[in-house]
């Protein structure tokens, strides 16, 4: 759904001009309108690229879930959160966020070094999204 400038401005303010997920401040430009329930965009193979032996997909502009493409299903999100969330449900996204520390520990020598020197301290706690805190009035 293409948002008008007014709708986009209102959506940005939905949670106090912050990302619905991590709570970072959203500038006027550069943030994403995230479909909370994914619309799942349809794509097809680009035959022009295929003729050159390249596999490339292109969006058709259609959705597998067109009913999810509505204003009430949009949250303001920073680009990193929206790109990590992809088409996950909220609970699957929460799970993905909770796995990040262990993934960093497994795959990043920089993370392990910083942790060993006390520069990073992993904390076991549930992932609570900004919009949940905002709606409960506990956001700070």
Task: Annotate each PLM feature.
Residues 32-38:
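Histidine-centered catalytic micro-motifs used for acid/base chemistry in nuclease
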